[in-house]
Amino acid sequence: MKKQKFDREDARLILRLMRENNFPQIWVPGPQNRDLRQLLWHRHRLVQMRTRIMNQLQALAMNEGYRWKKKLFSEPGRAQLEKLTLAPWASRRRQELLELLDRLNPTIAELTAAIEREARKRPEVLRLMTHPGVGALTALAYVLIIGTPTRFHCGKQIGTYVGMIPCEDSSAHKQRLGHISKQGSSLLRFLLVEAAQAAVRKDPDWRRRYTHLAMRRHKSIAKVAMGRRLAIRLYWMWRNGYGYSRSLEFGSYAGQPGTGHGGQ
């Protein structure tokens, strides 16, 4: 369901589609594609479970006056956690949470290795991984969920497809913009935002753009904007068949020179 409503444009679009009999076709992923998505989702959910468990262990330590943050899960930190003198039920909770953590870690590592193996089989995934901040998980998810770049005429359509553009409810001469539409894959949106933040830390140009947006708007808005920028950049890298270093020769969205999003 389209979440951008503007009466005149919608009317023109419907009229053109009826006149040309050119309604868009629906792309359906194949069985292998759908099964590999299960691999991505399975790992994602297990990582979320692990994060919740680690947060609970942090809370247990803080209740005893210890604030170790990430150090809690190093070998010395864990040893200190296990030495804490706790009440009976708190002690049992600590033990069972640590047991769950010990079971999750090797499973997540196994799934991560499987994702990396699948990524190495696909040249287009390896090409996307040349972009700063983009690892095997993000690149493979992007390729599986987008399917084929030829489905889209320009990079701007990618932002719409992944649900990272504002909702719009406009009529007459009034334009009303809301939150992002959140259409498409929530997993891909999450990965794009995470990868964009990694790119901000590694790439000076991305850091400059993010800082500018964060100062003008808000950090959360800037993060989504950089995630959308990354989605468009990856689209053009994939469609045109070049790596990150070559993409720097083009515009800010790595499309065609001088055309903004790459579309004429």
For each predicted feature, which ranges?
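Short, amphipathic alpha-helical segments that act as regulatory/interfacial helices
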Residues: 15-19, 40-43, 47-50, 54, ...
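Glycine-rich, often acidic, oxyanion-interacting loops/wings at catalytic, nucleic-acid
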Residues: 40-127, 253-254
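Short alpha-helix plus adjacent loop in nuclease-associated cores
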Residues: 1-25, 34, 38, 77-83, ...
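Phosphate-backbone recognition surface of nucleic-acid-processing proteins
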Residues: 127-130, 136, 140-220, 254-256, ...
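Basic, amphipathic alpha-helical segments enriched in Lys/Arg and hydrophobic/aromatic residues
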Residues: 214-263
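Short helix-capping/linker segments at secondary-structure and domain boundaries
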Residues: 21-24, 53-54, 108-109, 147-151, ...
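Short coil/turn segments at secondary-structure boundaries
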Residues: 28-31, 59-62, 70-75, 115, ...
